[in-house]
Amino acid sequence: MHGSPCQDFSRIGKKQGGVKNSGTRSSLLFETIRIIKEMKDKPKWIIWENVKGVLDRNMRDSLFIYLKELEDLGYESKYEILNAMDFGIPQKRERIFVVSCLGANNFSFNKLERKETRPLSEFLEKDVSELYTMTQPYMLKFLNKSIDNSFRGRLKVIKDFSYNIYTKQMRVPNSGIIDIGNGRYRYLTERECLRLMGFDDSDIDKLEEVHSRRKNCTSSKLYKQAGNSIVVDVLMCIISSIMHVSANLLLWMI
C-alpha cells in the first residue's frame, strides 16, 4: 500500500504532474514499479491512493502509464474515486484508489461496505484553547459580511462536515473553520484533524508524545501528519474486502 506525493497532481498546486523521470515529487509514483521489479517475490496486492486531480486531462497520462507498467508485470488494476463521507467520516475528502492484483482481479469497489456519515460533533473537542481562535481582522471582516460563505473561495464555515484536510491548517485552512458564536471562529485542532482522518485518540496520544509542541504553539508536524495521511476507515474497508476476496479464492482452490 502506498500513496506517492500528491503536490504536483493537486488542483491547488503548481500542477507539474508526475511524468516519469521528470524529477517532480509526484513522479515518485514510478518508484513502485522499480521496487516491484527488484523484488524476488512480487506482492499479490498493491493499493495506491492520491488526489483525484490525477484524473484531470493534463495529469492522467501518468496514471495510465503507471497502470500499463503494472499490467506488463502481470497486474490487473481497478480504480475509483472514493469519498470519506461514504465510510462514516464527516470529511469531504475525495481520493482516487487503485487496487492492483497479480493475476485476475476479483476485487470490486461496488462491494465495499459504505457507512452512514457520523455526526461531526463526535470528532470535535469540547474544551478548545483560545490558541485556535481566529484573530486575523481581514478574515473576520470578510466572514461577518456573510459573502457566499467563503474567503477567496477557500475559507468555509464547517457545518455538518469538514472539507479537505491538508498539511497546513492555520491561516486559510481548506478544511474550514468552526463557528463558536458571537462572530467568532476557530480552527480545527490537530486532534480533530487526526480524528477526521480516522485515527483514534490512543494513536493520537502516541503521536503527541513523539511530536511534542512548544508552549502556546500549535503543532505544524501534527497538522502535516494528518494532511498527508490516508483516511483509515476507507483504507481498512478496502483491505477487508481484499481479504474476503483472497479467502474466497483459497476456498475455491481447496
Residue ranges of model-derived segments:
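N-terminal Rossmann-like NAD(P) cofactor-binding module of classical short-chain dehydrogenase/reductase
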Residues: 1
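Conserved NAD(P)H cofactor-binding loop of Rossmann-fold oxidoreductase domains
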Residues: 4
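Class I S-adenosyl-L-methionine
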Residues: 7-172, 182-186
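C-terminal target-recognition/interaction regions appended to catalytic cores
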Residues: 137-254
